[in-house]
Swiss-Prot record:
Reaction(s) catalysed by this chain's protein: hydrogencarbonate + L-glutamine + 2 ATP + H2O = carbamoyl phosphate + L-glutamate + 2 ADP + phosphate + 2 H(+)
EC number(s) on file: 6.3.5.5
Keywords: Amino-acid biosynthesis, Arginine biosynthesis, ATP-binding, Glutamine amidotransferase, Ligase, Nucleotide-binding, Pyrimidine biosynthesis
Binding site for L-glutamine: S47, G240, G242, L270, Q273, N311, G313, F314
A GO biological-process term: L-arginine biosynthetic process
Active-site residue list: C269 (nucleophile), H353, E355
SMART domains (alphabetical): CPSase_sm_chain
One Pfam family per UniProt: GATase
Entry annotated with the keyword ATP-binding: yes
Keyword Amino-acid biosynthesis applies: yes
Top EC class of this enzyme: ligase
Function comment: Small subunit of the glutamine-dependent carbamoyl phosphate synthetase (CPSase). CPSase catalyzes the formation of carbamoyl phosphate from the ammonia moiety of glutamine, carbonate, and phosphate donated by ATP, constituting the first step of 2 biosynthetic pathways, one leading to arginine and/or urea and the other to pyrimidine nucleotides. The small subunit (glutamine amidotransferase) binds and cleaves glutamine to supply the large subunit with the substrate ammonia.
Listed name of the protein: Carbamoyl phosphate synthase small chain
């Protein structure tokens, strides 16, 4: 027998559906993701902390879940506060599957709802903007309780989540990407890169390792002096959740590294925004953000278009860029900034996710550019 569930939006909209995860309640900012696949990677992406993720593709869970496809680093954890889908298939099938999506959600205590009109929900979020919401799952639940909890959630503006989503102890990383029939590879490592962990995705670390980087991953609040004492060949700024402007410790550390050294610096997602803020620019909250694996982005220098993975609710405000920041990429959906490069330092960043997971690999050459900067600096 199915368990009822309710999704309430702060504007008063109510959706009634079926629970497919843990019973209880959860709140967060409701966003929509247009990726057709990769639901496990999305759920375990730390960038989704404090968010209720709506997947617009109607059938979610076809291929089940496994231990390998997690993006939450050494600790297998679901970071999304909740999941919202249209339909959960009765059967799951894949040679790598270890359990169903419903079993996975219950195991990780994730409150989730299915059997609602996700097209209607997506239109609301697109037109009105991302808004706070609540999922209630269980018997004897009420719309009034769900709505009250949705309106009580504080939102993401001004919220520093990077220090909460990083590994507090730091760690070393040497593992490369997964290959069919081989599993995860062990590449030859030629460079030492310190990676700031603001909520880093596992596949980012693997793609850096694929290119010869031995990674020392440090917590978000690590001072610049400690990073420089490690004598790295380059510094990486990871993705992560929350409001970048609230991460004053990260902004200060990156500013010190960029302004006082010539170390190559590469930032992704939140790391992109941190580099911009450290260089004197400002960021802004977006209407409904970019979440998906089919976002077109133009490379302004080459005039080419890339299909990218995106996951962010804040953006760099191009009108505030200082003279030493050059715009390199721009979204073809809404014209927002997607990439910058310092003109006076070997530092650059990209708003989207070149590591994909899930999504296309059109932007993978950005990792190669980072290696080129490291090679040039070592000469």
């Amino acid at each position: 027998m199915s368990t009822p569930a309710i999704l309430a939006l702060a504007d008063g909209t109510i959706f009634k559906g079926t629970s497919i995860g843990a019973t209880g309640s959860t709140t967060g900012e409701v966003v929509f993701n247009t990726a057709m696949t990769g639901y496990q990677e999305i759920l375990t992406d730390p960038s989704y902390a404090q968010q209720l993720v709506t997947l617009t593709y109607p059938h979610i869970g076809n291929t089940g879940c496994n231990e390998e496809d997690t993006e939450s680093g050494r600790i297998h954890k679901v970071w999304a506060n909740g999941l919202i889908i249209r339909d959960l298939p009765l059967l799951h099938s894949n040679f790598r599957s270890e359990q169903s999506l419903a079993e996975y959600l219950i195991q990780h205590n994730v409150v989730a709802i299915a059997d609602i009109d996700t097209r209607k929900l997506t239109r609301i979020l697109r037109d009105k903007g991302a808004q706070n919401g609540c999922i209630l799952a269980g018997e004897n639940i009420t719309e009034e309780e769900a709505l009250a909890k949705a309106r009580a959630f504080g939102g993401l503006n001004g919220l520093d989540l990077a220090k909460e989503c990083c590994d507090p102890n730091g760690f070393e990383w040497t593992e490369g990407s997964w290959e069919l029939g081989k599993g995860f590879t062990q590449p030859e490592l030629k460079y030492h890169v310190v990676a700031y962990d603001y909520g880093v995705k596992t596949n980012i670390l693997r793609m850096l390792a694929d290119r010869g980087c031995k990674l020392t991953v440090v917590p978000a609040q690590t001072p610049a002096e400690q990073v420089l004492a490690l004598n790295p060949d380059g510094v990486f700024l990871s993705n992560g959740p929350g409001d970048p402007a609230a991460c004053d410790y990260a902004i200060e550390a990156v500013k010190t590294i960029v302004e006082t050294t010539n170390l190559p610096v590469f930032g992704i997602c939140l790391g992109h925004q941190i580099l911009a803020l450290a260089s004197g620019a400002k960021t802004m909250k977006m209407n409904h953000g970019h979440h998906g694996a089919n976002h077109p982005v133009q490379n302004l220098e080459q005039g080419t278009v890339m299909i990218t993975s995106q996951n962010h609710g804040f953006a760099v405000d191009e009108s505030t860029l200082p003279a030493n920041l050059k715009v390199t990429h721009r979204s073809l959906f809404d014209g927002t900034n997607q990439g910058i490069h310092r003109t006076d330092k070997p530092a650059f960043s990209f708003q989207g996710h070149p590591e994909a997971s899930p999504g296309p690999h059109d932007c993978a050459p950005l990792f190669d550019h980072f290696i080129e900067l490291i090679e040039a600096a070592k000469k």
